[in-house]
Amino acid sequence: MALTQERKREIIEQFKVHENDTGSPEVQIAILTEQINNLNEHLRVHKKDHHSRRGLLKMVGKRRRLLAYLRNKDVARYREIVEKLGLRR
């Protein structure tokens, strides 16, 4: 299921760095994580949906690049977002 505007607004409010923030790496990573989790649930039911699986892999790659960017730019912010989202177990 696609991410609703309401859910996206909630994520932005939770992870924004400053007022009117919608594009910071933290917000982008949080939104991608939510989409990845939704798509994972879809693929558990629809195992042969290879088109969606490719979209999932693209999203995971984009999130990985954003995490690498954030880690290089500010390690404290990187650790905080990883902790909040429960990534890197």
Curated annotation (Swiss-Prot):
**UniProt superkingdom:** Bacteria
Recall the GO molecular function terms of this protein's record: rRNA binding; structural constituent of ribosome
GO BP of this protein:
translation
Which InterPro entries does the annotation name? Ribosomal_uS15, Ribosomal_uS15_bac-type, uS15_NS1_RNA-bd_sf
Q: Which UniProt keywords apply?
A: Ribonucleoprotein, Ribosomal protein, RNA-binding, rRNA-binding
User: In its keyword annotation, does this UniProt entry include Lipid metabolism?
Assistant: no
Q: Which cellular component terms (GO) are annotated to the entry?
A: cytosolic small ribosomal subunit
- Description of how the protein assembles with itself and partners: Part of the 30S ribosomal subunit. Forms a bridge to the 50S subunit in the 70S ribosome, contacting the 23S rRNA.
Q: Which PANTHER family match?
A: RIBOSOMAL PROTEIN S15, BACTERIAL AND ORGANELLAR, SMALL RIBOSOMAL SUBUNIT PROTEIN US15M
The record's family statement is: Belongs to the universal ribosomal protein uS15 family.
Protein name as it appears in the record: Small ribosomal subunit protein uS15
Question: What species does this protein belong to?
Answer: Geobacillus stearothermophilus (Bacillus stearothermophilus)
